[in-house]
């Protein structure tokens, strides 16, 4: 079964972070980006700018109030939570074994990583060979690339 990868940017206030995540996701060939719990500048300017980009490219941007809404509405087979300090599995150039169906990959939009309650029930992952937090856009670039190129076509 092919893998459909959908990135989720959660708990974000930065305009630039939303726009950069949209550019990254769409440039990797992904059709959908989900933004949850956007507030401040991200909600006022980042989401509209990302929506403009999505419409221009024929892609989708889904904006929801909470992470659980994305999980409930998109019904993923797997949820991967990017948690540098509590990773159970590492994602490297070979992708991640055992993934199939729809996979949500949740990146924290702020400096603190995902709260343990937000990552509950998810597979906690980080990047093979990277020590410490490098920021959500760098994490997304590496993890999404590895998932998409490591095994099967994960374009969603």
Swiss-Prot record:
The record's keywords, sorted A to Z, are: DNA-binding, Endonuclease, Hydrolase, Nuclease, Restriction system
The record's family statement is: To M.jannaschii MJ1199.
Question: Which is a Pfam family this sequence falls into?
Answer: DUF2122
InterPro entries attached here? DUF2122_RecB-nuclease-rel (IPR018665)
Enzyme superclass (EC): hydrolase
Q: Which domain of life is it from?
A: Archaea
Q: Does the keyword Membrane apply?
A: no
This molecule's function is given as: A putative type II restriction enzyme, its methylase would be APE_2002.
Name the EC number(s).
3.1.21.4
Q: Which GO terms describe its molecular function?
A: DNA binding; endonuclease activity
What name appears for this protein in its UniProt entry?
Putative type II restriction enzyme ApeKORF2002P
Q: Give a yes or no for keyword DNA-binding in this entry.
A: yes
State the reactions this protein catalyses: Endonucleolytic cleavage of DNA to give specific double-stranded fragments with terminal 5'-phosphates
Example GO biological process term?
DNA restriction-modification system
């Amino acid at each position: 079964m092919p893998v459909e990868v959908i990135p989720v940017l959660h708990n974000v206030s930065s305009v630039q972070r939303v726009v950069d995540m949209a550019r990254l996701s769409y440039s990797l060939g992904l059709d959908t980006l989900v933004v949850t719990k956007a507030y401040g500048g991200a909600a006022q300017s980042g989401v509209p700018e990302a929506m403009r980009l999505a419409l221009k490219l024929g892609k989708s941007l889904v904006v929801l109030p909470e992470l659980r809404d994305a999980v409930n509405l998109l019904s993923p087979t797997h949820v991967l939570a990017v948690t540098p300090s509590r990773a159970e599995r590492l994602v490297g150039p070979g992708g991640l074994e055992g993934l199939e169906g729809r996979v949500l990959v949740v990146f924290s939009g702020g400096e603190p990583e995902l709260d343990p309650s937000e990552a509950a029930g998810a597979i906690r992952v980080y990047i093979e060979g990277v020590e410490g937090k490098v920021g959500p856009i760098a994490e997304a670039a590496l993890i999404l690339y590895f998932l998409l190129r490591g095994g099967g076509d994960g374009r969603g």
